[in-house]
Amino acid sequence: MNEFVIKDGGARTEFASGMVRDTAEGKIDWELVFNGPMLERWAIHLTKGNAKYPDPEPGKANWQRASGIEELVRFRKAACRHFAQAMRGDTDEDHFAAVFFNLNGMAYVDGLLHRDTAPQVKKLH
């Protein structure tokens, strides 16, 4: 724990209070994902999916077992189907959230299949 170094971008911003911080230049603005309804709708979709397909082990969702082309194709087909249903105006389920879910699944499997070229995403926990 004591071995880490606080990263330094070099540029500083001084606030009216006198507090000084690195600038936010070039950093991801994670607050932006909270704008609009989709983050909550996706979380609701994931919660309902987790009730239907429980975690096979603590901290690992059922969909995270996906690891190959077959699963990637299933995610892709489902994303296309839910997109068409959303565009058609179907309201039998949250098709917009289902598109998010399936695109995320595709990206997850694609990352596993192309680890050397895929952007690396770290777990938050």
Predicted regions span which residues?
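Intrinsically disordered, low-complexity regulatory regions
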Residues: 1-125
